[in-house]
């Protein structure tokens, strides 16, 4: 069964409608999962800080919900992911109240606390207060663009899985995901960006719904996400001091993977340039240096990314460091 949100509110002062939405859903007593910086947006309900929750104990995490009829995540990625996980384990509805728009986790059924990611259910309601979101750090909103453009290469990888490995593929989900990315890119390249936060939130919610339709992260996560996860491993392995975000890394990864698809004549140069210009338009990183990585680190990440998940992509069985360097140079990432 496909589960998608029953209520999606995307507007200024949307948070004022939380009591109304709860009443419509016949919910009286939610537990709010939030952070210290976003606690101020919760004025009415019991709450717990996300960093006080032990997420490794999956069997007992449901106990946080014992005295409540629902779970509400208020904040960025981690409060929302942890809220989804508690709701899933306790079999209670989840409401997503994002305070920024850096990735499609605000709407998807995926929990990305660990790798591989964890499938739960999509939120029963999404309340996105644009007045709050547009005040969030520009870096977070730029990262959201990186997460959206990655749909282009993710869908290409999914189609490749269907062709080369007879993988199950959903035309409706694939087309929906790709269209969301193209429409947002078209907007940022042909506007003054005044409505960018709202357009971005709509795109991220649409991307999350495409995942719910497919019941798989495939329409929004491919080899570019593997590249991002590889960079996360590099950060820890080499103790690299950079504040690069998931969406930023996915955006740069999308350029690298798009270059490979271009060389295999499966993506045209116009689409590649559209991706690059869209990232630049919102001041998202397009080079390794802008992410905070040396050339050799991103080369190692690209050449090792294929091994991080049993998922067929354009990386197939992996590429050598020599090949990775050529791809990264041609795409001007290094």
Curated annotation (Swiss-Prot):
UniProt keyword Thylakoid, yes or no: no
For this protein, the record's Gene3D superfamilies field holds: 3.40.50.1970, Dehydroquinate synthase-like - alpha domain
> For substrate, which residues are the binding ones?
104, 147, 229
Compartments, as annotated in UniProt: Cytoplasm
Q: What does the record give as EC number?
A: 1.1.1.261
Report which superkingdom the organism of origin falls in: Archaea
A Pfam family hit: Fe-ADH_2
The molecule here is called: Glycerol-1-phosphate dehydrogenase [NAD(P)+]
- Reaction(s) the record says it catalyses: sn-glycerol 1-phosphate + NAD(+) = dihydroxyacetone phosphate + NADH + H(+); sn-glycerol 1-phosphate + NADP(+) = dihydroxyacetone phosphate + NADPH + H(+)
The scientific name of the source species is Methanococcus maripaludis (strain C5 / ATCC BAA-1333)
Q: Which GO terms describe its biological process?
A: glycerophospholipid metabolic process; phospholipid biosynthetic process
Q: Detail which positions bind Zn(2+).
A: 147, 225, 246
Its ancestry begins with: Archaea, Methanobacteriati, Methanobacteriota, Methanomada group, Methanococci
Gene encoding the protein? egsA
Q: Give the pathway annotation.
A: Membrane lipid metabolism; glycerophospholipid metabolism
């Amino acid at each position: 069964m496909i589960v998608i949100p029953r209520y999606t509110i995307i507007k200024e002062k949307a948070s004022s409608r939380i009591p109304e939405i709860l009443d419509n859903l016949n919910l009286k007593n939610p537990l709010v999962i939030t952070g210290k910086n976003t606690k101020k947006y919760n004025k009415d309900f019991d709450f717990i800080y996300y960093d006080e929750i032990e997420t490794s104990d999956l069997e007992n995490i449901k106990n946080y919900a014992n005295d409540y009829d629902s779970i509400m995540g208020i904040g960025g990625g981690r409060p929302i992911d942890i809220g989804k996980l508690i709701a899933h384990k306790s079999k209670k509805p989840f409401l997503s109240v994002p305070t920024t728009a850096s990735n499609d986790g605000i709407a998807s059924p995926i929990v990305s606390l660990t790798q591989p990611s964890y499938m739960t259910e999509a939120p029963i309601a999404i309340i996105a207060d644009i007045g709050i979101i547009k005040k969030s750090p520009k870096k977070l909103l730029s990262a959201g663009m990186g997460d959206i453009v990655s749909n282009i290469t993710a869908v290409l990888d999914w189609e490749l899985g269907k062709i080369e490995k007879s993988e199950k593929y959903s035309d409706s989900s694939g087309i929906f995901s790709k269209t969301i990315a193209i429409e947002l890119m078209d907007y940022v390249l042909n506007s003054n960006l005044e409505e960018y936060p709202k357009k971005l939130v709509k795109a991220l919610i649409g991307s999350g719904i495409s995942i719910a339709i497919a019941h798989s992260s495939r329409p929004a996560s491919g080899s570019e996400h593997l590249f991002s996860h590889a960079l996360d491993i590099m950060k820890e392995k080499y103790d690299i001091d950079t504040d690069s975000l998931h969406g930023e890394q996915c955006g740069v990864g999308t350029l690298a993977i798009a270059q490979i698809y271009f060389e295999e004549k499966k993506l045209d140069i116009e689409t590649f340039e559209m991706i690059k210009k869209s990232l630049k338009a919102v001041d998202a990183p397009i080079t390794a240096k802008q992410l905070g990585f040396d050339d050799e680190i991103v080369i190692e990440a690209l050449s090792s990314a294929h091994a991080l998940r049993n998922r067929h992509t354009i990386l197939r069985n992996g590429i050598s460091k020599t090949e990775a360097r050529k791809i990264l140079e041609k795409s001007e990432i290094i």
